[in-house]
Amino acid sequence: MARFTLPRDLYHGKGALEALKSFTGKKAMICVGGGSMKRFGFLDRAVAYLKEAGMEVELFEGIEPDPSVETVMRGAEAMLKFEPDWIIAMGGGSPIDAAKAMWIKYEYPDITFEEMCKVFGIPPLRRKAHFCA
């Protein structure tokens, strides 16, 4: 595993997924796409590492390529019900992008998509949850 910081730590390479064991919190939601993360065993390993860290884990699966507003809204609603301390996106750009939008709606349920699209229009995050991709 390798690590560099800019201003956050980035873990990559062999063994990087194991860093999930060091996360602190009570609940984590993992957002994934079509199934490759499950097929190749990464999803099960991520869940196991988070549980080893003492967290309850919930999955939001099936994020489609070029995620729809409806998918983002369903994910945000799931987050509002589950109240995760960590939002973890796994897979390609679509699950990561969708999870980031869900995170904003989770932290600020009344924010509109128009407000979210304004340059520098998003209020400060990490008040309810941290994000990991």
Where are the predicted features?
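Glycine/threonine-rich beta-strand-loop-alpha-helix active-site module
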Residues: 70-133
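ATP/NTP phosphate-donor binding region
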Residues: 1-86
